[in-house]
Amino acid sequence: MLNIKWIRENQKLFDEKLSQRFIEPMSSKIAMLDREKRKIMSLIQEFQHARKVKSKILGNMASKSGEEFEGLQRDVKHINEKLEALEQDLNNNNELNELLNMFPNIPDEEVPYGMDESMNKLVRTYGETNPNALNKQHFELGIKLNLMDFEQTAKISGTRFVTLKGDLAKLERALINFMIDVHTKELDFFEISPPVLVRDNAMYNAGQLPKFAEESFATTNGYRLIPTAEVPLVNIVADTIIPREKLPMRYVAYTPCFRSEAGSSGRDTRGMIRLHQFGKVELVSITTPEESKNEHEYITNASETILQKLNLPYRVMLLCTGDMGFAAKKTYDIEVWLPGQKQYREIASCSNCGDFQARRMKARYKEFGSNETTLVHTLNASGLPIGRTMVAILENYQNEDGSITIPDVLINYMGGLQKITAYSE
């Protein structure tokens, strides 16, 4: 959520930032609703003060009868009626909060202006792409190996699901353990095993609701399946005040993730790129406003480290204003090279959300010896999605005979297996 005080004091700048997100100017409407709300709150305070004064006089009166006493009683009753009506008006005046809840985060000054991914800015590349490399797509390889099943799975669960078998199932497990080990043993992240069912309020805190309600799966009793472990991880600090010396707090978690893929009809309908259910290792960092810029680079580097150890070519893109996620003020996308598609595809998104999520969930910190609290900054990064990493390995490590060479760093995790070959039932 955006800071209403900042909007109030920077109306022109606010409209300029909204225009960078391709949203029409809204400062005038917000200012009007804000004035109405503040007027009601001011009246409530005045009446509360008047009630306190008159109640004190009543309590100190020696005689609990007579015209003066009864007149004060009538005054207090009248004040209570006014307060009840004003508080009802305040509770019913949800338009301002509803409006604020629909605004995305304000872009950082370093974010390039642009409407879509074509305007994203290249930051760096890693590894070399070979235009003459073997170029079968991952689903062709997986099906030929008899280790990736879409057809029978569709009978069980419908489209956008997959069943992995044998050594591909083992590779999935190996990648999870490898990623968690790197992040915890080398990169100072603390492992968490969170729930995958959360309440709506946790989704709201993370910026998933109310804007993206249709993109998640809801149960019939008030829970939602998480679209990313970012949701439970950032909520670890909801409604807390953290001692400054404990920051940064860096968390890593592997979870299954669930997305309805609303609006993705016709996109990546074959293979494992876009599924309703997928596994992902997620990184979250909680830090101070002063350190969030450096922490953004750190958490992005953590995602890159996995790809470097797997020797997978990739590039880092700085997203433009029109391509950033809702809660982000600045985002790097990491795109891995896929020979089967002859293009880079997103494999990780690394975002600095500033105090956007913290304001929603009241996550604060304070210096030692101080009573003053400040909103934390939250950051998140994919570290990495297991399915898309498998896609990249299958396509970049494929051999002429259709087998898949295991990347060196995964051989021990695969029990010494160096190559995945076709499975014969």
Swiss-Prot record:
Pathway: Aminoacyl-tRNA biosynthesis; selenocysteinyl-tRNA(Sec) biosynthesis; L-seryl-tRNA(Sec) from L-serine and tRNA(Sec): step 1/1. GO terms for biological process: selenocysteine biosynthetic process; seryl-tRNA aminoacylation. It comes from the Bacteria. Homodimer. The tRNA molecule binds across the dimer. GO terms for molecular function: ATP binding; serine-tRNA ligase activity. It comes from Rickettsia massiliae (strain Mtu5). Consists of two distinct domains, a catalytic core and a N-terminal extension that is involved in tRNA binding. This is Serine--tRNA ligase. Keywords: Aminoacyl-tRNA synthetase, ATP-binding, Cytoplasm, Ligase, Nucleotide-binding, Protein biosynthesis. Belongs to the class-II aminoacyl-tRNA synthetase family. Type-1 seryl-tRNA synthetase subfamily.
